[in-house]
From Swiss-Prot:
Biological process annotations from GO: DNA repair; ERAD pathway; glycoprotein catabolic process; protein ubiquitination; response to unfolded protein; SCF-dependent proteasomal ubiquitin-dependent protein catabolic process
Residue intervals of the F-box domain: 3-50
Record key words, sorted: Cytoplasm, DNA damage, DNA repair, Phosphoprotein, Ubl conjugation pathway, Unfolded protein response
Protein name: F-box only protein 6
Modified sites of kind Phosphoserine: 251
GO CC annotation: cytoplasm; endoplasmic reticulum quality control compartment; SCF ubiquitin ligase complex
SMART domains named among the record's database cross-references: FBA (SM01198), FBOX (SM00256)
Span of domain FBA: 71-252
Involved pathway(s): Protein modification; protein ubiquitination
Organism: Bos taurus
Classification via InterPro entries: F-box-assoc_dom, F-box-like_dom_sf, F-box_dom, F-box_only, Galactose-bd-like_sf
Length: 265
């Protein structure tokens, strides 16, 4: 019985096989095999089908996608890159930059003179004191699975969100700083709005802060996230701003027209 080359299979059968091969293996191991495999693996239809199969889009998806291959990888990597954002593990994963007053503390929602959080799944928050309290994380994008060409050529949006609230019976000041940095930690882009001061006898409402980094310079390899604050009345205890549910998420920008070629991840 004569052996049959896999390349003699109809292209639709080969595409079905490729549908079940992990995406990184497709680019690293399968795409270099021959011109036929390269051309099939570069087909938009393959990556769109993989997106459908993984649940990244639905059949009625109507938003424009300029590069389905990039879209697939960004969807597969999409998650909150900050660890322990809602204080479920006390202060784990956070670097304490300033620990003034009676220092950082974790409390359960809604807290004294506080209000419930909009998302009922969030149960805890970090709270500051009467002198400056700041905490931070540094995200290593390469360690999180984002390779250089994906970041430099396609420059996906980097969406930063944070939530803060005062106590109703005490004024406070809240601040946030987020920086995109190079491999050697040179700052390439930053978000650092003026501190927010809330007066005593407020509604203790939770407020969302949001910023999207787009079209930033190439070379981003790290993200520095820092937030915190203090109360304005210098009261002993934990009367400063409360923070929780912070997030840094990298997402595909569907309206962008990036270069077509993408190197192996």
């Amino acid at each position: 019985m004569a052996l049959v080359s896999i390349n003699q299979l109809p292209e639709n059968i080969l595409l079905e096989v490729f549908m079940h091969v992990p995406a990184r293996q497709l680019l690293r191991n399968c795409r270099p095999v021959c011109c036929l495999w390269r051309d099939l693996i570069d087909l938009v239809s393959l990556w769109k089908r993989k997106c459908l199969r993984e649940g990244y889009v639905t059949e009625d998806w109507d938003q424009p996608v300029s590069d389905w291959k990039v879209f697939y990888f960004l969807c597969s990597l999409r998650r909150n890159l900050l660890r322990n954002p809602c204080a479920e593990e006390d202060m784990k994963s956070w670097k304490i930059d300033s620990n003034g007053g009676d220092q950082w503390k974790v409390e359960s929602l809604p807290g004294a003179h506080g209000t419930g959080f909009p998302d009922s799944k969030v149960k805890k928050y970090f709270v500051t004191s009467y002198d400056m309290c700041l905490k931070s994380q540094i995200i290593d994008l390469k360690a999180e699975g984002y390779w250089e060409e994906l970041l430099d050529k396609f420059r996906p949006d980097i969406v930063v969100k944070d939530w803060f609230a005062p106590r109703a019976d005490c004024g406070c000041t809240y601040q946030i700083r987020v920086q995109l940095a190079s491999a050697d930690y040179l700052v390439l882009a930053s978000f650092e709005p003026p501190p927010v001061t809330i007066h005593q006898w407020n509604d203790a409402k939770w407020t969302e802060v949001s910023h999207t980094f787009s079209d930033y310079p190439p070379g981003v390899r790290h993200i520095f996230f820092q937030h915190g604050g203090k109360d304005t009345q210098f009261w002993a205890g934990w009367y400063g701003p409360r923070v929780t549910n912070s997030s840094v998420v990298i997402s595909h920008r569907v309206t962008r027209n990036p270069p077509h070629a993408m190197a192996q991840p």
